[in-house]
Amino acid sequence: MKNLFRKLFFSLTIILFNSIVADAGSYPDYTREKNIHNQITSYIFDSDIVELSSKLEHKFNLLATDSSSDTSILLLHGRGLHPSEPNIIDPLRVDLINVGYNVFSLQLPVLEKGKSYNDYFKIFKFSDTRIESALNYINSKKNIIIAHSCGAHMLLSFIDNIGIGNISGIILLGAGAVDKDQVMKTDINLSSYKIPVLNIYAQYDHNSVKQFADVLIVQYSSTQDKYLNTLEVNDADHNYKDQTYILIESVKKWLKAL
């Protein structure tokens, strides 16, 4: 009887421990975010760093440049990065500021390095409410979201769980990227929202990104010319190395035509 009790107690202890570990893994890495904050505050001079809060969190950053335009652009970075990451988000941010748009770039929740799409999926509830808070703060007549990679996953989660809200248009960059042997868990038909979408992917992008591009084309098959534009950037990889200029010019051309 004592041995049975010990085995039962040991089993319950393991279950409780695994539950605690799993729960701990479903929160952003705030230490890493604090380090990011300390780094970017030393070199960001063209934007205000605004501290926002959400239903789930007390403090996270939004880079904000208000140019008194009717159009605001919210940038969502890729996995584990920050609102001024140098490959895609910051070049876009600076160039769009120079054009005269109101430009905002949100710190999305991050995990420790090496985490996969499936790990990040567990914290999408935090990105949902961060995006909601950012859009409430911006509150422009026309709100466009540009989202890269995991930022695109988080945007789709936001739309699926909270709604399209006051979003006027979407630009997806490298959307649909997942790790090997993983699949997208957010099942959403963007065509039902009837807003303009520009989906950009690279010639040498991940297979999952190209598969998602095909899914979008099928979703928009009846209204494709009206709402969906698709662009493949030649000689580019997922981070558009050496092709950032073409990416930015394509984005600006689409925005101007809205």
Each predicted region: which residue ranges?
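The feature captures the conserved acid-bearing segment of alpha/beta-hydrolase catalytic domains
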Residues: 174-232, 237
